[in-house]
């Protein structure tokens, strides 16, 4: 019975018994206490706790679930998985044990022809909580289960909770006896490999408190009603009904496992560590595909870290299995094909899923080999003892190894890791990074000098720039080369602290004001303004004339044109942010920005590239609002009041109790301390010029505003006019005209490539005739020259020769393509049986070329950096064949 049919029967059975079918929620938990959905009941948690009234008295679902506490056991046992489906039926104060137990028994034992799962009653066992006599009595008296197949267990096994504060209760688990071939008898208390848990009935009636161990945690009291929460693992049920040994061999997992075996040249079922790795890869790929589909992207924190860890475990496992090229794309494609019938959105989101998976694999693949070598060297240094925290830190910082991966690899080698030392170094790195960022903002002076200046000032610098463009101020401090001085003279770089200023200090993505500080004897040209400490604004510049002294009065005057240009950019950023939220949803949250004169960039969260059509809609939306000349206003209010009014706060930003809210008409409201124009009409025009990725799940647009945008559009118009003249076509026909030219060019290139390959394949008869007999094998080891030589051409020629020479063929070809040497090897079935492997031959040849390579036993490819060694590489490969079979 296919997994989809098992799920369909589940939902149909309970729907007929007045349960409402509820679709699965995404894996991302809407729960502050959990990263992911870890149980089928989790979406219903508020109803169990009485926090909200249940919309229905009964419900049923097939819920996607992700659990990683037992990640190290995945692939090693027959039952552990990270991603799986939990079939559940739920009662919110409607029925309890007396109904839940018979319903479960009915579905399990009803014949397949009648819509059930057709379990033989004598193969089923149950466990109940130690003192749950009521459940035991129902199993025996109502269902008719013999007493000797009802076993009792303690809190650790038969009292269920999610592991965090929330609903909990005693449970009764149903087990299937797979037979004596899976081990000793005696029921689930004796052997959980033979007796496989298929269904857990939780009698949800208590509230769990925080803390405590799995077998002893606090119970705060009873829930408002007695509820039922049951969970049947779809994958475990499929293993039983499909007659396979474990959950990795069912219809929704085995295709992925087989693809991993195919990509690595392995054969599943031979036992040993490779089987474990193949099972682990199959499981993790399922989880990866579903996580990315549900919006998770790789990162170093929380959900993203879990995804990254899963991905990097797959990459490493595939490499250990023999893969030398990226494989994630094909593995994920297999998972998408498997699950699309149940989840059509996978097909729609395929390109986004591929992009995330391929990008993360490429990132890790580039450092994996070097990182593994570094790890092995560290293990040798440890001498079977402890891998230092410093070594683990280097693996993390330089090679991208999550600490969990290092711990796993170390355990395989029988080595422990100094985790405490590693975490101390990580904390130190974060501290230094924070200080470096602050130092970049603070310039030459250290923080002690700034603290002294702030203490001397005695109060925050008064910022007048929201309403003033110039004004008198008193010099309260001067710093030269990081030290406080009483005066600074012409030619010196100086940092000036004033008691009040119209200059805006860089912050919130807005670049600082420029301008001048004029005094009786001269002036200072200000080219940077920073706020190294809260309330302390520092003006940096060069004394152009005269000598400035502490206590002197200056006229602080900003560059008004620059301020206006930056303000236009800042207002434009707010508008673009709001428009992206309109077209992409609230997930398009601001992740950073830079507002400069005439241009701005805006970073926002989004799992994939924004389609050009959406960029066009965003651009049209904001420019339309410029024509409406909306008023831009600022208002100071309490933070809670601002958020309640709908104002958007930037994620990760810290705000005080009093905040400044910028409103653009009634359309946009954001918390912001920057400067803005009074009306949107002042912006003129906004033009988005690019959209790109700056990290997993984060996109960046670059845009122009005002005259800069106009000049860009004018240049574009000139270019279009020139192209139209060159191609003798109207502007609106240019895309089709250019597309036609490119198509013809591609066709010509394909024909040229065919001619090159044909010329190269014409060498096959000559090379075949020149074969060498080595122990009965037909060996062609040759250098190939000509303008058709490249990796593709050599692969075609090697394949052709192998077909010509039959099972005894051993073909090694090398040449120079684009100044770099390439080597390929192809081996026939008879030669394979005699121990000749293409990967080993390529390895020998590539070593002479100063490089490396790999592939399948019957076909492999490599390269190097030394084209002068091609002949030597071919000879070395021939010698290797002779050594093997000669």
Swiss-Prot record:
Recorded GO MF terms: alanine-tRNA ligase activity; aminoacyl-tRNA deacylase activity; ATP binding; tRNA binding; zinc ion binding
Co-factor(s): Zn(2+)
Catalytic reaction(s) noted: tRNA(Ala) + L-alanine + ATP = L-alanyl-tRNA(Ala) + AMP + diphosphate
Binding site for Zn(2+): 570, 574, 672, 676
Chief location: cytoplasm
UniProt-listed InterPro entries: aa-tRNA-synth_II/BPL/LPL, Ala-tRNA-lgiase_IIc, Ala-tRNA-ligase_IIc_anticod-bd, Ala-tRNA-synth_IIc_core, Ala-tRNA-synth_IIc_N, Ala-tRNA_ligase, Ala_tRNA_ligase_euk/bac, DHHA1_dom
One of the record's GO cellular component terms: cytosol
Principal EC category: ligase
EC number from the UniProt entry: 6.1.1.7
Keyword ATP-binding included in the entry's annotation: yes
Location of this chain's protein in the cell: Cytoplasm
Record-linked Pfam families: DHHA1 (PF02272), tRNA-synt_2c (PF01411), tRNA_SAD (PF07973)
Annotated signal peptide: none
Keywords from the named record: Aminoacyl-tRNA synthetase, ATP-binding, Cytoplasm, Ligase, Metal-binding, Nucleotide-binding, Protein biosynthesis, RNA-binding, tRNA-binding, Zinc
Claim: Disulfide bond is one of the keywords in the record: no
Superkingdom of origin: Bacteria
Cofactor note: Binds 1 zinc ion per subunit.
PANTHER family in the record: ALANINE--TRNA LIGASE, CYTOPLASMIC (PTHR11777:SF9), ALANYL-TRNA SYNTHETASE (PTHR11777)
Family assignment from sequence similarity: Belongs to the class-II aminoacyl-tRNA synthetase family.
Protein function: Catalyzes the attachment of alanine to tRNA(Ala) in a two-step reaction: alanine is first activated by ATP to form Ala-AMP and then transferred to the acceptor end of tRNA(Ala). Also edits incorrectly charged Ser-tRNA(Ala) and Gly-tRNA(Ala) via its editing domain.
Note on domains (UniProt): Consists of three domains; the N-terminal catalytic domain, the editing domain and the C-terminal C-Ala domain. The editing domain removes incorrectly charged amino acids, while the C-Ala domain, along with tRNA(Ala), serves as a bridge to cooperatively bring together the editing and aminoacylation centers thus stimulating deacylation of misacylated tRNAs.
Name of the molecule in the record: Alanine--tRNA ligase
Name of the coding gene: alaS
């Amino acid at each position: 019975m296919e997994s989809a049919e098992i799920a369909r029967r589940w939902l149909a059975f309970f729907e007929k018994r007045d349960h409402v079918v509820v679709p699965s929620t995404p894996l991302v938990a809407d729960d502050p206490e959990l990263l992911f959905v870890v149980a089928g009941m989790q979406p219903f948690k508020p109803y169990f706790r009485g926090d909200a009234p249940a919309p229905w008295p009964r419900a049923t679902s097939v819920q996607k679930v992700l659990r990683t506490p037992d990640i190290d056991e995945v692939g090693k046992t027959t039952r552990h998985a990270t991603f799986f489906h939990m079939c559940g039926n739920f009662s919110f104060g409607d029925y309890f044990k007396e109904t839940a137990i018979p319903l479960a028994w009915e579905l399990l034992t009803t014949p397949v022809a009648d819509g059930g799962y057709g379990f033989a009653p004598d193969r089923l066992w149950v466990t109940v909580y130690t003192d749950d006599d009521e459940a035991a009595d129902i199993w025996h008296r109502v269902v008719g289960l013999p007493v000797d197949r009802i076993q009792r267990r303690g809190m650790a096994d038969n009292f269920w909770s999610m592991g965090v504060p929330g609903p909990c209760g005693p449970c009764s688990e149903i087990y299937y006896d797979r037979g004596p071939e899976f081990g000793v008898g005696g029921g689930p208390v004796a052997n959980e490999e033979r007796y496989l848990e298929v269904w857990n009935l939780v009698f949800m009636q208590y509230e769990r408190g925080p803390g405590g161990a799995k077998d002893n945690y606090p119970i705060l009291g009873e829930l408002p009603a007695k509820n039922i929460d049951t969970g049947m693992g779809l994958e475990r049920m499929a293993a039983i009904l499909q007659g396979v040994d474990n959950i990795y061999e069912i219809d929704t997992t085995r295709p992925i496992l087989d693809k991993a075996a195919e990509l690595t040249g392995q054969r599943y079922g031979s036992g040993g560590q490779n089987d474990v790795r193949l099972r682990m890869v199959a499981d993790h790929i399922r989880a990866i595909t579903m996580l990315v589909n549900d919006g998770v992207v790789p990162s170093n924190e929380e959900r993203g870290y879990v995804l990254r860890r899963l991905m990097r475990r797959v990459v490493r496992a595939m490499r250990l299995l023999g893969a030398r090229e990226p494989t994630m794309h094909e593995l994920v494609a297999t998972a998408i094909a498997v699950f699309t019938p149940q989840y059509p959105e996978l097909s729609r989101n395929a390109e986004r899923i591929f992009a995330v998976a391929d990008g993360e694999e490429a990132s890790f693949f580039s450092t994996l080999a070097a990182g593994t070598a570094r790890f092995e060297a560290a293990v040798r240094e440890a001498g079977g003892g402890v891998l230092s925290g410093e070594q683990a830190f280097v693996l993390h910082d330089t090679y991208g190894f999550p600490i969990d991966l290092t711990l796993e690899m170390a355990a395989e080698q029988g080595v422990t890791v100094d985790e405490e030392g590693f975490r101390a170094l990580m904390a130190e790195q974060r501290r230094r990074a924070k200080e470096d960022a602050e130092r970049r903002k603070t310039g030459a002076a250290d923080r002690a000098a700034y603290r002294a200046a702030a203490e001397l000032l005695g109060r925050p610098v008064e910022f007048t720039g929201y309403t003033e463009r110039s004004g008198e101020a008193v010099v309260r401090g001067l710093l030269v080369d990081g030290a406080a001085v009483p005066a600074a003279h012409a030619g010196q770089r100086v940092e000036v602290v004033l008691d009040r200023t119209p200059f805006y200090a860089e912050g919130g993505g807005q670049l600082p004001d420029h301008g001048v500080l004029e005094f009786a004897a001269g002036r200072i040209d200000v080219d940077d303004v920073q706020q190294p400490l809260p309330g302390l604004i520092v003006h940096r510049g060069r004394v152009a004339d005269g000598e400035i002294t502490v206590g002197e009065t200056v006229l602080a005057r900003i560059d008004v044109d620059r301020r206006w240009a930056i303000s236009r950019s800042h207002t434009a950023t707010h508008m673009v942010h709001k428009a992206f939220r309109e077209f992409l949803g609230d997930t398009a949250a601001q992740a950073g920005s830079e507002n400069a004169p005439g241009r701005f960039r805006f970073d926002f969260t989004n799992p994939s590239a924004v389609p050009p059509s959406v960029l066009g809609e965003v651009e049209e939306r904001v420019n339309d609002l410029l024509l409406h000349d909306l008023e831009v206003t600022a208002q100071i209010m309490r933070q809670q009041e601002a958020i309640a009014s709908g104002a958007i706060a930037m994620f990760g930003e810290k705000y005080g109790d009093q905040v400044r809210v910028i409103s653009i008409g009634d359309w946009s409201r954001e918390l912001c301390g920057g400067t803005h124009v009074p009306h949107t009409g002042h912006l003129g025009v906004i033009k988005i010029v690019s959209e790109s990725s700056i990290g997993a799940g984060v996109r960046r647009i670059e845009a122009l505003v005002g005259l800069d945008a106009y000049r860009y559009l004018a240049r574009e118009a000139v270019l279009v006019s020139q192209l139209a003249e060159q191609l003798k076509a109207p502007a609106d026909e240019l895309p089709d005209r250019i597309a036609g030219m490119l198509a013809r060019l591609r066709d010509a290139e394909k024909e040229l490539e065919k001619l090159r390959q044909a010329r190269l394949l014409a060498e096959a008869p000559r090379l075949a005739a020149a074969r060498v007999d080595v122990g009965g094998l037909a060996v062609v080891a040759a250098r190939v020259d000509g303008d058709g030589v490249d990796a593709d051409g050599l692969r075609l020629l090697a394949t052709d020769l192998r077909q010509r020479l039959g099972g005894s063929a051993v073909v090694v070809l090398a040449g120079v393509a684009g100044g770099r040497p390439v080597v390929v090897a192809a081996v026939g079935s008879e030669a394979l049986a005699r121990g000749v492997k293409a990967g080993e031959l390529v390895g020998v040849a590539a070593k002479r070329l100063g490089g490396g390579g790999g592939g399948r036993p019957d076909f492999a490819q490599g390269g190097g950096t030394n084209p002068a060694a091609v002949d030597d590489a071919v000879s070395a490969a021939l010698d290797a064949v002779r050594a093997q079979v000669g």
